[in-house]
């Protein structure tokens, strides 16, 4: 009887996870490593390669906090300054764990993107495709089952996933640029159910749209507003905010800048982010406070994130006030 009850409870938990957690990972610092947001951003940088990693710890007040980690790598395969076009390749991996069952996912995707400059190159269009494999699963080591007949259809599920994206960059003047992009992931909506009780446990299509701009003022300062929206199944998230950046030294040999900003997740959380850009490195930290109905349960403790990005530059040319992301 105890085994049967345990089985029912565990099946219920898994059914809940299948429905509620059939979502992709997301970060408050969602554009620190933009490859996680849109495959078209692969190669969208003024360097030959870029590497990044982000770690998120959420709900530290509970016994088993939610943890998410991601890493990315991108490289320019070919670039033509004459035709202002080229190909880029990228790879991203992620892992997250949640709850006492350590229910989580691991995903790895390969990306290829193509960009084309328009006119004098102040406008750039990029498209990207991605394909990969994911695995979701849980750990039953902490569950005691006295009835050997109790079992689950599978504790781990491996599935393929496909995605595509498009991005546009526009340099309006020497002091102003904007970039926008949209992507669709899980186009194939793979089945990730563990039990027969899950009526609809597909990883739903994930739509993202994103915009970022920078306006340079007072020579050494920049204002960077940002907005992002994503929808997956019944889950919606609207993020908006702005950073202020101080460019201390823009010589590549001594490059140094500091930034700070506020990010809001509509009706959910507010976050403060800090970053240091030094030579080819970017170090970032973000802390958010829970403002949703879960604030009481979490003691308003939201999450913190840390991230690092490293770029390999092709030469030591002086960076322009507003950098073209590719040339």
Predicted regions and their residues:
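A generic N-terminal leader/anchor concept
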Residues: 1-6, 22-26
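Short, basic, low-complexity termini and linkers enriched in Ser/Thr/Gly/Pro
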Residues: 2, 9-19
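Subset of outer-membrane beta-barrel
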Residues: 23-327
């Amino acid at each position: 009887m105890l085994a049967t009850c345990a089985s029912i409870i565990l099946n219920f938990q898994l059914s809940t996870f299948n429905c509620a957690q059939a979502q992709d990972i997301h970060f408050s610092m969602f554009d620190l490593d933009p490859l996680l947001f849109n495959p078209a951003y692969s190669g969208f940088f003024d360097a030959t390669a870029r590497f990044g990693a982000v770690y998120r710890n959420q709900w530290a007040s509970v016994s088993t906090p939610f943890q998410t980690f991601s890493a990315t790598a991108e490289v320019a395969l070919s670039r033509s300054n004459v035709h202002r076009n080229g190909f880029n390749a990228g790879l991203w991996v992620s892992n997250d764990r949640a709850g006492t069952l350590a229910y989580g996912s691991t995903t790895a995707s390969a990306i290829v993107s193509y960009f084309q400059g328009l006119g004098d190159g102040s406008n750039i269009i990029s498209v990207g495709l991605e394909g990969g494999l994911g695995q979701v699963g849980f750990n039953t080591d902490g569950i005691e089952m006295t009835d050997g007949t109790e079992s689950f259809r599978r504790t781990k599920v491996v599935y393929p996933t496909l995605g595509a994206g498009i991005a546009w960059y526009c340099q309006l003047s020497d002091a102003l640029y904007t970039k926008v992009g949209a992507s669709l992931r899980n186009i194939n909506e793979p089945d990730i159910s563990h039990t027969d009780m899950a009526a609809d446990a597909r990883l739903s299509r994930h739509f993202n749209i994103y915009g970022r701009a920078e306006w340079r003022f007072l020579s050494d300062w920049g204002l960077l507003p940002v907005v992002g929206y994503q929808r997956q199944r019944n889950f919606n998230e609207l993020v908006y905010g702005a950073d202020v950046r101080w460019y201390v030294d823009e010589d590549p040999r001594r490059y140094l800048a500091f930034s700070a900003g506020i990010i809001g997740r509509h009706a959910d959380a507010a976050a403060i982010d800090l970053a240091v850009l030094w030579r080819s490195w970017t170090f970032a930290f973000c802390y958010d406070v829970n403002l949703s109905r879960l604030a009481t349960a979490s003691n308003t403790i939201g999450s913190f994130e840390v991230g690092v990005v490293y770029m390999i530059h092709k030469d030591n040319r002086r960076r322009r006030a507003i950098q073209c992301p590719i040339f």
